Amino acid sequence: MAKTVYLGMIGDIMHPGYINIINKATEYGDVIIGLFTDKAIANHRRLPYLTWEQRKNVVESIRNVSRVVPQDDWSYVSNLLKYKPDYIIHGDDWQVGPDKYIRDEVFKVMEKLGGEVIEIPYTQNISASGIKQEIDALGVTPQMRLSSLRRLIAAKPIVRILESHNGLTGLIAEHTK
């Protein structure tokens, strides 16, 4: 039975960095892509340009990808426990910074599963975030903003705010559901 390699990604704007890590993953076994859902992304970053289904179609068409599964949480733990890969591969950019806690979780889970974490050098001078900034600088239409707002509302809970200026409106705000 072939070994399995888990790779989590957003997969919105495909670039050489994604292809590099997928190709490296195939050296270790069959590649399972944990494709972050809009819900998982919405609490940490801006929504992707493409919907989850569109991103899934793109990633599935990449030659070395064996399977694409939804990753509903920013944390990898639930998918690692569900799919029990032999390896997880990730760029080394998570060794420091805001995603370090995720790295620490992954190491603990993979140790428990008897698997291995493989970190490869992050591809320099290109990132989906940088490409997105360039695209955003070109501007968007009102229809694109409306479509993005609808997807965002569907992906994460709405925050409701009721302004209070006196005791009565304060009581109303406290008891409003």
Where do the model's predicted regions map?
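Nucleotidyltransferase catalytic core that binds NTPs
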Residues: M1-M144
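Short amphipathic alpha-helices and their capping/turn segments at secondary-structure boundaries
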Residues: Y18-E27, G167-K177
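N-terminal amphipathic alpha-helix/helix-capping segment at the start of soluble metabolic enzymes
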Residues: I131, G139-T176
